[in-house]
A protein has these predicted regions:
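Active-site nucleophile/metal-coordination loop of metallo-enzymes that catalyze phosphate/sulfate
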Residues: 22-31, 44-133, 149
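His/Asp/Glu-rich, glycine-adjacent segments
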Residues: 87-205
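Acidic/histidine-rich catalytic neighborhood
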Residues: 236, 243-286
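Metal-dependent active-site segment of extracytoplasmic phospho-/sulfohydrolases and closely related
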Residues: 36, 54, 216-259
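Active-site neighborhoods of enzymes that stabilize oxyanions during catalysis
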Residues: 272-384, 388-396
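Bacterial N-terminal signal peptides
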Residues: 7-16
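A long, amphipathic alpha-helix that forms part
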Residues: 27, 168-179, 196-237, 397
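Positively charged n-region of N-terminal signal peptides that target proteins for export
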Residues: 1-4
């Protein structure tokens, strides 16, 4: 009996010790700090449509934009890197999710891990490189570009992207960085969550999948807020919560098959390089074939076909050598594909077609609008501001961190609109 009692006391001591070790200490000597959080595919209207108590609290107490305008094309990699650098995709090198680069005759895609980590693709200067160059430490977690050495610099902390890495563990990793000694602690941290984007793609923006995904990411935000409060720094850390783009409802039967608009027997003769992105396509014709291909594709419905030099200025798109000489843009709700890539639509139990979601369309469309919410000592409180372009966020972060910004495309008026 005595042995059982002593064992019990020892167990209580171990549990108490573990709890004590797990209880964070207040963080002291905190420098101006930014945590940039990306909720991929989160439409601003979701805040009113679906329950998200933590995000709603941050938006109510802090500052939010009516919406943030993504850069064209409204795809994941181009827009994350536009936010990070303040440069439009036309200037930052990441002109799409799938890219053909004539300068080294190579292709890039999100799934080509070796290329994702190769700095030759990533132009400009992301905020974490700006911080490292000026003596601050950075920790971009799963943010596009963070795996590469850019301008001779790497972040102090980074991790190879793993979409299966649990959301709560991402939060805990960020909090652990804040627990580091002052000399080791990063001032620029990023987090990335793909749940809402996956839900939107799988079932469309008006779906139970999206509702559940928002609940999950909001729980993660709650864990972050509670972790900051436990360290007595919730009101001392600047949180910036953004999305890269919105989401449009798509009928999977709405496909423009490019093969139908040129002579397949001439395919080898034409020999074009194509960078496929579903909602838009870059075509690099062989010399002398541009007019033929352009004339053929102009016959296709539900797309707009531009010569590179004729892309409207409002897109800020058309000077990079990684943009095709011909660019085909899909109408909202349509996709572009080749015959060998088209798959039959998924059917629901009642036999009807399952609608899905897509993005990458005209960045001025309401369905493509992105989220911006910020909370912290640098930001205005209980404010709603007019829409602005996502390339403006870089200057906002640089101002908070007291960094000299690299050359960028952002409008500094947004800094004044958001900050105290």
């Amino acid at each position: 009996m005595k042995r059982i009692f002593l064992t019990f006391i020892a167990l209580v001591f171990v549990v108490h010790s573990a709890f004590a070790q797990a209880t964070p200490k207040p963080v002291k000597d905190l420098k101006p700090t930014v945590i940039l959080i990306s909720l991929d595919g989160f439409k601003p209207e979701y805040l009113e449509k679906y329950p998200a108590p933590t995000l709603s609290m941050l938006a109510k107490e802090g500052v939010r934009a009516k919406w943030m305008t993504p850069s064209y094309p409204s795809l994941t990699f181009p827009n994350h890197y536009a936010i990070a650098t303040g440069l439009y995709p036309d200037h930052n090198g990441i002109v799409a999710n799938n890219i053909y680069a004539p300068e080294f005759n190579e292709t890039f895609s999100m799934s080509k891990r070796e290329e994702v980590g190769n700095g030759r693709w990533w132009l400009g200067e992301p905020i974490w490189v700006t911080a490292e160059k000026q003596g601050q430490r950075s920790a971009p977690l799963f943010f596009p570009g963070s795996e590469a050495e850019i301008a001779g610099k790497r972040p102090s902390f980074w991790k190879v992207f793993n979409d299966d890495f649990p959301n709560f563990e991402r939060i805990d990793m960020a909090l652990s960085w804040l627990d580091l000694p002052k000399t080791e602690r990063p001032t620029m941290i990023t987090l990335y969550f793909s749940d809402v984007d996956h839900g939107g793609h799988d079932a469309g923006p008006d779906s139970e999948d999206v509702k559940q995904a928002i609940a999950r990411v909001d729980q993660s935000l709650r864990r972050l807020v509670e972790g900051l409060k436990a360290r007595a720094i919730f009101d001392r850390v600047n949180l910036i919560i953004v999305s890269d783009h919105g989401m449009a409802r798509v009928d999977p039967r709405n496909v423009v098959v490019l093969d139908d608009y040129y002579d397949a027997n001439q395919a080898q003769q034409i020999g074009w390089n194509i960078a496929w992105n579903s909602s838009m396509v870059h075509i690099f014709p062989k010399p002398g074939m541009e007019d033929t291909i352009y004339a053929s594709l102009k016959k296709a419905p539900h797309v707009t076909v531009y010569r590179k030099k004729e892309i409207p200025a409002r897109f800020h798109y058309g000077t990079s050598n990684r943009i095709g000489e011909i660019v085909v843009m899909a109408e909202e709700g349509w996709s572009i594909n080749s015959r060998d890539r088209v798959r039959p639509p998924q059917l629901l139990p009642d036999g009807s077609v399952k609608y899905r979601g897509a993005h990458g369309f005209d960045n001025q469309l309401e369905s493509m609008r992105a989220l911006f919410v910020a909370h912290g000592p640098a930001f205005k409180r209980a404010a709603v501001v007019e829409p602005f372009a996502n390339v403006d966020v870089y200057n906002v972060m640089a101002k908070i961190l007291k960094l000299k910004p690299a050359p960028n495309d952002g409008n500094k008026a947004t800094v004044k609109a958001l900050l105290r």
